[in-house]
Amino acid sequence: MDPQTALSRALLLLLFLHLSLLGCRSHPVGGPGPVSELPGLQELLDRLRDRVSELQAEQLRVEPLQQGQGLEETWDSPAAAPAGFLGPHHSILRALRGPKMMRDSGCFGRRLDRIGSLSGLGCNVLRRY
């Protein structure tokens, strides 16, 4: 056996023995771990649940107030004006605010079924990563 090969194997053996004596063991996440962490995690989970319930209760309190203010603002807004007041621009604005599904469905308004839906090479293709 070559002296360099023997030396490298001996060093690897010594490294392996050293690591095995140190207690290099894996600690799986789902396996039995330190029990001292469990109460801390349980307390953190309880605090998170309390905070979520507080936020939900606050949202329920604020929601009716916002709806009431929305009614008052509707009377003062220009959207409450008659349709003739805004003229032809109103229909254009409504179309722009409408769903974008038809507008962004393909490349320059045409749907590229073969390229766009199968390979992801067409225009405006949503990636599913």
Swiss-Prot record:
It comes from the Eukaryota. It is found in: Secreted. GO terms for molecular function: hormone activity; hormone receptor binding. One of its GO terms (cellular component) is protein-containing complex. Pfam families: ANP (PF00212). Residues 1-26 form the signal peptide. Keywords: Disulfide bond, Hormone, Secreted, Signal, Vasoactive. The keyword Nucleotidyltransferase does not apply. PANTHER family: ATRIAL NATRIURETIC FACTOR PRECURSOR (PTHR14066), NATRIURETIC PEPTIDES B (PTHR14066:SF10). Cardiac hormone that plays a key role in mediating cardio-renal homeostasis. May also function as a paracrine antifibrotic factor in the heart. Acts by specifically binding and stimulating NPR1 to produce cGMP, which in turn activates effector proteins that drive various biological responses. Involved in regulating the extracellular fluid volume and maintaining the fluid-electrolyte balance through natriuresis, diuresis, vasorelaxation, and inhibition of renin and aldosterone secretion. Binds the clearance receptor NPR3. Belongs to the natriuretic peptide family. This is Natriuretic peptides B.
